[in-house]
Amino acid sequence: MGFWENNKDSITSGLKSAGKYGYQGTKYVAKTGYKASKKHYNNSKARRERKSGKKNSSDEEYESEDEMEYERKPTDIRSLKDPKSFPPPPLKPGQKTYAGQQQQQMPNGQASYAFQGAYQGQPGAGSMEQSQYAQPQYNQYPQQQLQQGVVPQQPPIYGEQVPPYGSNSNATSYQSLPQQNQPQYAIPSQVSLNSASQQSTGFVSQNLQYGTQSSNPAPSPSFQNGLQCHQQPQYVSHGSTNLGQSQFPSGQQQQPTTQFGQQVLPSPAQPHPQPQQQQQGQPLPPPRGQVILPAPGEPLSNGFEQQQQQQQQQQQQQPLNQNNALLPQMNVEGVSGMAAVQPVYGQAMSSTTNMQDSNPSYGASPMQGQPPVGGQPPVPVRMQPQPPQPMQQGNIYPIEPSLDSTSSTPHFEVTPFDPDAPAPKPKIDIPTVDVSSLPPPPTHRDRGAVLHQEPAPSGKIQPNTTSSAASLPAKHSRTTTADNERNSGNKENDESTSKSSILGHYDVDVNIMPPPKPFRHGLDSVPSEHTRKNALERAVPILPPRNNVEPPPPPSRGNFERTELVLSTNAANVQEDPISNFLPPPKPFRHTETKQNQNSKASPVEIKDEVLPGHPSEEDRNVEPSLLPQSKPQSKSQSQFRRAHMETQPIQNFQPPPKPFRRSQSSNSSDSSYTIDGPEANHGRGRGRIAKHHDGDEYNPKSENSTENGRLGDAPNSFIRKRAPTPPAPSRSEKLHEGAITSEFDSSKDANKYEKSIPPVTSSIQAQQSTKKAPPPVVKPKPRNFSLKANEYPKELTREATGQDEVLNSITNELSHIKLRKTNVNLEKLGGAKKVKDSSPVPSDLDEKYVSASGSITPPRPPPSRSSPKKVPPVVPKKNDNLKKKPPVVPKKKPLLKSLEPRPIEMERAYSGDISAADDNLNPFERYKRNVVPQEDDRLHKLK
């Protein structure tokens, strides 16, 4: 049976069930998806229809919606707009003018807005001017209240209450008011109608900073108070208005529950003592933080005023609660709708306080004639609450706190707090902390105090050092305050014990230590006066005190002056021995080096006359006089003079100065000493000279014994003895040859060692003294170096190899190879065999010699020396070959470039034809020139 036959039933049933459920699932999914898509489409279509019905384009819809939302948001902000856009409040029935105008006629003659009437019902036009935009609104309310009697009115939101700053429907003084920019949110200036009896509002005394009126001198004090109260929300409370009282009771008293709506309306029947109030209430300039309220209809600061009122009320509720009984009775003419704002921002200035009055101070009582009463002193601080003063009940209308505040002005709160200047206080505190936290200055003060103690003895002992050093720290200590010095005096005791390493040394050890430092400068100053003319003289006087060796002056041509200077400096320094010990060590070495350089550069004649006398004196100072033989300076002076003379001549004769050692090896045995001096003078102004000088220094006594060899043999003999003391017996000629070879090698190899061991000054001086006869033989050895006798060197090298190290022989052989090849170049110039130009010379005597010396080919004559050179020479010739191969490439490029550079100018007939691809490779621009230049060439020739 097949698999299908056995399982076809189960398979078919499974497929059927799977297909069935799959179909159901797909159908369900399709239906749900269709429904969802259809629903979404319908919704979107409805939305589109709605949008299309409203507007044509979605962009406009979005823009309009955004604009609407944007407009909705700034509604609160627009309350801050200029109140000029709003009309002035209408006069209440029975009111000929605004309440403020009747009571007070400002000198401006402008009827104040109802805010004055609201506060005090004062008709003074100046009060209108004084009234800020919020005030006329408040005035309306107080006017109504005045007409209505005691009518608790919640003034509309400040924006609503406050008429536009510029708007003056009535004979309003808004225009004249400079405080229009200063909105008075709550300026319930309560002013009793009776000028003598009451000042309606203590608000006036507490200048509400928000609406403080810097405007006309005779604005209603209530308005002024309101303006001030804006900036001084704490002074919101309406002070009881006692016309007889010149004080403006604290605004808190008048309106303990003064809110934005709170307004104490002065009774209209009450006579308005605004002129008195004007006198009493001096116009207060708006505080810095005063915020200009927008049009009274705008609820700009209501929320903020409410907050301020709540704060002030909380501060003032107790006095206000005390006055609450009076508040229904209180007849506050100056209390206007602004009064509600005043409790928040500040005490409403009583209408009696006239802005015309000169009271610019925030806390200044608005009443001119009357001093502030009831604890209403002029309030410099905006938020300072004043103690509430009971309002006269007869004059007080019941006041309804108006909590309505449509405008939120949190920034107003910030502004009054900012003028309080809390920030500068921490700034002031920070410098104080910094001044107190200055521990380091006491340490310096201690130094200064110690130095103050030092100058007296220092003037005796070390006037140069301690006086200068003490004076500077003394200045520093003087700069520090006396208190700091006193504190430092106490700290010095503690710190000197705790920090003896610092303060103790400054007190005690510093007296010893500092003098050397300044005294070094002092030494410089003292001898500098004598020796500024010559830098060498400065170093010389310093050297003898260092070693305390004053006798060295005997080598003397120019030492007499130096010794005198040294003696003078020593006499000056006798008092300060340790200082003299400290100073000289660095300076003498430095100056000696400079002297060596100067002497080496100087001409040989100058070296003989000037340098020789001075240097042996220095050498004697540095070295004991017993160790220095008298013959040394002579041999050195002669050798150095000879070398200096050698330097001039061989440099001119020989183009390759860097490789003089090779030539010296190739030189004859008799002239080897001369060649040594010559190449050393040429090549190793550093190495060759120094090594030979040192050799002469150490072995000059032997050179004295060897008078036959004279100055020539001194250096090589002494040098060979240094390197290999075993073969002292070889003949003088052999010694000279060996010295010529080994001295060069040793000078190049061990020059540094001798330089370190022995100062170069002595070598230069002795060489100069001993090198008088050297210059004439120097010229001779050079052709002898080129002579065929160069083969003799390997023989002598083998002799030396037996007695000396083979390494020296190998090195000398290498040097000979190098020099021989380059001597070939010199021979070419001299007229020698031109065949030598090639690294492999044509077979000849010279060629054989070169081969033997190099060891590359069978060296018949010097077999013993071959062993050492075989190892080394292959490396050297390779280097030489490379060097020889490289320089010809460079000159080839240079002439090509040189030829090419002038040719583009001349270019152009022969050049374009002569130069081919090689030129193109060198200068790609020339190809371009070839194509272009011929035309230009024609032009140029035409011009020519």
From Swiss-Prot:
Low complexity compositional bias, start-end: 93-105, 130-158, 245-267, 306-318, 625-640, 664-673
- Please list where the region (Disordered) is annotated: 1-331, 349-805, 821-901, 916-944
Q: What is this protein called?
A: Altered inheritance of mitochondria protein 3
Which residues fall in a compositionally biased region of kind Polar residues? 166-244, 349-362, 461-470, 760-771
Chief place where the protein resides: membrane
Q: Residue ranges under compositional bias (Pro residues)?
A: 374-390, 859-876
Question: Gene behind this chain?
Answer: AIM3
Please list the residues that carry the modification Phosphothreonine: 726, 858
Its family remark reads:
Belongs to the AIM3 family.
Identify the InterPro entries for this entry.
Aim3
Query: What is the organism field in this record?
Result: Saccharomyces cerevisiae (strain YJM789)
One GO term of the biological process aspect:
barbed-end actin filament capping
Look up the signal peptide feature and give its range.
Answer: none
Please give the residue positions where the record annotates the modification Phosphoserine: 57-58, 64, 471
Bias (Acidic residues) occurs at 59-69
Quaternary organization: Interacts with RVS167.
